[in-house]
């Protein structure tokens, strides 16, 4: 329940909320993405036969990777989220005035999460390392491509790997 409740709360947010302040954004990202990283971590550790794991390091890494994935998805889907779904996930960001400085700030935030996650991948059980490492590499490439895409183009197109 401690992981599934926040997950379903975030999914419900998508039904009723179209914009976020910092507090609701943090809650949404935790429930929609960070808890998924924590669920995966539990499965990886359980499968490896470890009864426990280094809580702070692996937990922080799992949460950071989940957050990075979600934020990259938000950046990738700016146009569709705003134009089609009427949503704006990033607090204080108006897609109509989205500029390079805003894009760079958001990309740097994602990069910080990716960097933290990268330092913990090697600590995962061996059978999970490659898959998580590949997923990390995919989202790293996506973040790099978003960084290289001009802000005015990012709000009208979907960056792909």
Kindly label every feature range from the protein language model.
Residues 1-69, 75-161:
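Catalytic cores of Mg2+-dependent Asp-rich isoprenoid enzymes
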């Amino acid at each position: 329940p401690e992981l599934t409740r926040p997950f379903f709360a975030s999914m419900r947010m998508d039904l009723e909320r179209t914009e976020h302040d910092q507090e609701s954004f943090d809650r949404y990202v935790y429930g929609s993405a960070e808890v998924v990283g924590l669920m995966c971590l539990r499965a990886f550790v359980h499968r490896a036969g470890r009864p426990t794991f280094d809580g702070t390091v692996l937990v922080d890494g799992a949460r950071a990777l989940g957050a990075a994935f979600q934020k990259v998805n938000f950046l990738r889907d700016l146009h569709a989220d705003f134009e089609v779904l009427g949503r704006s996930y990033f607090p204080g960001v108006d897609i109509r005035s989205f500029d390079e400085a805003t894009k760079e700030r958001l990309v740097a935030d994602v990069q910080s999460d990716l960097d933290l996650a990268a330092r913990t991948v090697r600590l995962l059980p061996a059978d999970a390392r490659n898959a998580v490492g590949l997923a990390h590499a995919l989202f790293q490439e996506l973040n790099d491509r978003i960084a290289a895409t001009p802000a005015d183009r990012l709000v009208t197109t979907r960056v792909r790997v």
